[in-house]
């Protein structure tokens, strides 16, 4: 298939874009197109006026019947329609679970004010069903509240519900308890996997049904699966998911999204295929044309930036390149979704990882060099896209919300500390097992195992030698309280010196994020997998502590006997200090330049991981998570104590 011809210089692309920027046009208008030799490009009448978009919003459109559809006639190229009117999707991604609920409205208003008409979001299974059969749609996970807020603001919604979402999340958004059974095959019609999917759908989809367009809601489309073409191991899986959604009452447009080279293996019959890409080029739509020549083009993810990994560089993308690409989408009548409009944060242990020869964890920030920053600030990309969208609009865009000021608080100097070994008694009852048990198979959390955090394996030994263990992702090895080495994917052996007396062998293993892409997800069990041996003799009789770092643990930890912080301390420990936020807390960023590796907890809430290898050097702290005046700050530092924790009003990513 040839690429689209260049737009004729006598035809104004802005005029063309004005015709198709139509989620808000007045009812009754349906522009016509002449048939082009290349079906991708239709010519609008050069004198076609711009239109007022105010009558086709979720609040204004009362009489609904047909929803978002596709149309292909001999008079023009294929296009989307909404309630019979020609429609072009200007979408932007915001993940409700990566943004404090108190800031949802602000981010959605900024999306609307930029000129977008649609918000898209993934729905993470692992967060909504953290334990098998235990569902959570409350607080920051209140999907319905987010969708209804979008409607109230005047935005349509494209919902991308998990099973698998990728999205740089731990295990691609799949619950870790699925890894308990080695016979369960992820993203297939394997009986055990399908049973879990069915139960999840039985709780999720009834919440989505009343939010659909034809139920007077804002949801105009639902994604069936995410990038299955890159995974495709079961030809019956996609048709199964398609039917599962229809059977439960999803009536809006269904779609799939895949990389441009994986559309053929990722699409399924009866579902619109969309693509994900970084830039347009000659062969962008070749595979898409092969599977659906008579359907409109939809770019489900246009990557305006990229994610970062620990030890890698910070990724940025030029704003002019983004502006040019989006103007090309408009020129060629391509519906699109900007990924990400606002990335937010991988708070807590939410981050995923990549595996391309080695395991690399995703950083805490999901800034993504997006249209809005991690803290919701405007960027050059925002200003350029807003100007572009205004140029094709018949009416002024909404006024942009004002940015609240950031704060620089006094440095926090921890005054108390608690070595990890003194905190063990405040953890839940340890597991005692003959052999090591991997994180997912620990008999805790109502049989769902441990999803995130760290796990400590303890065993008394009386002789040294060659220690061997498979630890995922990284393990610190101690004799009593003294660290003697590190185990990881590339280093499975360690020499233990000869012992005069029996000592405690302690292996502290951290999950740095499960891989979120590729078939590697099937093998992402964490902790120690397999046996632990010294001189090829397997060890037996382990005490296993789970360090999930939940808020309930920090509530218990407050009653511990903390000690004054020494000048220097090596080894894992908790450090406690106070952040003084004054009477009106504001957003800030915490700088931990003189600390090494660990996690920050504010009033028991996990902000995420810090690591001195970068690229990320600051952690975003939302002001809405701070109390007036005094706030408890606890660091779990794995290596060596630092001095103070500085507050700054600018991030270093």
UniProtKB/Swiss-Prot annotation:
A GO-annotated cellular component: vacuole
Domain of life: Eukaryota
Species this chain originates from: Homo sapiens
Enzyme Commission code(s) on record: 3.2.1.-
Residues annotated as catalytic: 227, 301
Keywords, comma-separated and alphabetical: Glycosidase, Hydrolase
GO molecular-function term, one example from the UniProt record: beta-galactosidase activity
InterPro entries: B-gal_1-like (IPR026283), BetaGal1-like_ABD1 (IPR048912), BetaGal_gal-bd (IPR048913), Galactose-bd-like_sf (IPR008979), Gly_Hdrlase_35_cat (IPR031330), Glycoside_Hdrlase_35 (IPR001944), Glycoside_hydrolase_SF (IPR017853)
Record-given protein name: Beta-galactosidase-1-like protein 3
One GO process term, biological-process aspect: galactose catabolic process
Gene3D superfamilies in alphabetical order: Galactose-binding domain-like, Glycosidases
The keyword Kinase is assigned to this record: no
UniProt-listed Pfam families: BetaGal_ABD_1, BetaGal_gal-bd, Glyco_hydro_35
Name of the top EC class for this enzyme: hydrolase
Family the UniProt entry places it in: Belongs to the glycosyl hydrolase 35 family.
């Amino acid at each position: 298939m040839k690429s689209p011809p260049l737009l004729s210089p006598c035809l104004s692309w802005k005029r063309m874009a004005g015709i198709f920027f139509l989620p808000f046009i007045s009812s009754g208008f349906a522009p016509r197109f002449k048939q082009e030799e290349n079906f991708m490009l239709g010519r609008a009448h050069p004198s076609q006026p711009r239109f007022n978009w105010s009558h086709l919003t979720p609040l204004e459109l009362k009489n609904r019947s047909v929803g978002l559809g596709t149309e292909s006639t001999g008079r023009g190229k294929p296009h989307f329609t909404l309630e019979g009117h020609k429609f072009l999707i200007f979408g932007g991604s915001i993940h409700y679970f990566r943004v404090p609920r108190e800031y949802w409205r602000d981010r959605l208003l900024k999306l609307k004010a930029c000129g977008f008409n649609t918000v898209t979001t993934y729905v993470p299974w692992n967060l909504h069903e953290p334990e098998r059969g235990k569902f959570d749609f409350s607080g920051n996970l209140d999907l319905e509240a987010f969708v209804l807020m979008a409607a109230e603001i005047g935005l349509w919604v494209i919902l991308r519900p998990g099973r698998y979402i990728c999205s740089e999340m731990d295990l691609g958004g799949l619950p870790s308890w699925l890894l308990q059974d080695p016979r369960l095959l992820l993203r297939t019609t394997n009986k055990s996997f399908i049973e879990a999917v069915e139960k999840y759908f039985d709780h999720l989809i009834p919440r989505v049904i009343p939010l659909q367009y034809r139920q007077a809601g804002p949801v105009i489309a639902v994604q069936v699966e995410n990038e299955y073409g890159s995974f495709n191991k079961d030809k019956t899986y996609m048709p199964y998911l398609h039917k599962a959604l229809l059977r439960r009452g999803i009536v809006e447009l269904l779609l799939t999204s895949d990389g441009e080279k994986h559309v053929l293996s990722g699409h399924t019959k009866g579902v619109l295929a969309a693509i994900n890409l970084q830039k347009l080029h000659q062969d962008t739509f070749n595979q898409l044309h092969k599977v659906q020549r008579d359907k409109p083009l939809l770019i489900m993810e246009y990557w305006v930036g990229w994610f970062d990994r620990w030890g890698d560089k910070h990724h940025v993308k030029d704003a002019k390149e983004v502006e040019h690409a989006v103007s090309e989408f408009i020129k060629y009548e391509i519906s699109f979704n900007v990924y990400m409009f606002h990335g937010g944060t991988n708070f807590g242990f939410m981050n995923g990882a990549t595996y391309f020869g080695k395991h690399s964890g995703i950083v805490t920030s999901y800034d993504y060099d997006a249209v809005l920053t991690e803290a919701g600030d405007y960027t050059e990309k925002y200003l350029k896209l807003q100007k572009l969208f205004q140029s094709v609009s018949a009416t002024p865009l909404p006024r942009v919300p004002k940015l609240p000021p950031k704060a620089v608080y006094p440095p926090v100097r921890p005054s108390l500390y608690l070595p990890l070994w003194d905190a063990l008694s405040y953890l839940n009852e340890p597991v005692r097992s003959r052999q090591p048990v991997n994180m997912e198979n620990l008999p805790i959390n109502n049989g769902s195992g441990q999803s995130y955090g760290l796990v400590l394996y303890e065993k008394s030994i009386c002789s040294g030698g060659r220690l061997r263990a498979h630890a995922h992702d990284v393990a610190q090895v101690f004799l009593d309280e003294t660290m003697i080495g590190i185990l990881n994917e590339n280093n499975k052996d360690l020499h233990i010196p000869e012992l005069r007396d029996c000592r405690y062998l302690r292996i502290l293993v951290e999950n740095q994020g499960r891989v979120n892409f590729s078939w590697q997800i099937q093998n992402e069990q964490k902790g120690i997998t397999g046996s632990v041996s010294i001189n090829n003799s397997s060890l037996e009789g382990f005490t296993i502590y789970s360090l999930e770092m939940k808020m309930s643990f920090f509530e218990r930890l407050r009653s511990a006997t903390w000690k004054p912080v020494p000048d220097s301390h090596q080894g894992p420990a908790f450090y406690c200090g106070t952040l003084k936020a004054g009477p009106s807390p504001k957003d800030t960023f915490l700088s931990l330049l003189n600390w090494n590796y660990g996690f920050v907890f504010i009033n028991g809430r996990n902000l995420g991981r810090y690591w001195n290898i970068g690229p990320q050097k600051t952690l975003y702290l939302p002001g809405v998570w701070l109390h007036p005046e005094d706030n408890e700050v606890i660091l779990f530092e794995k290596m060596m104590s630092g001095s103070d924790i500085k507050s700054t009003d600018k991030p270093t990513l």
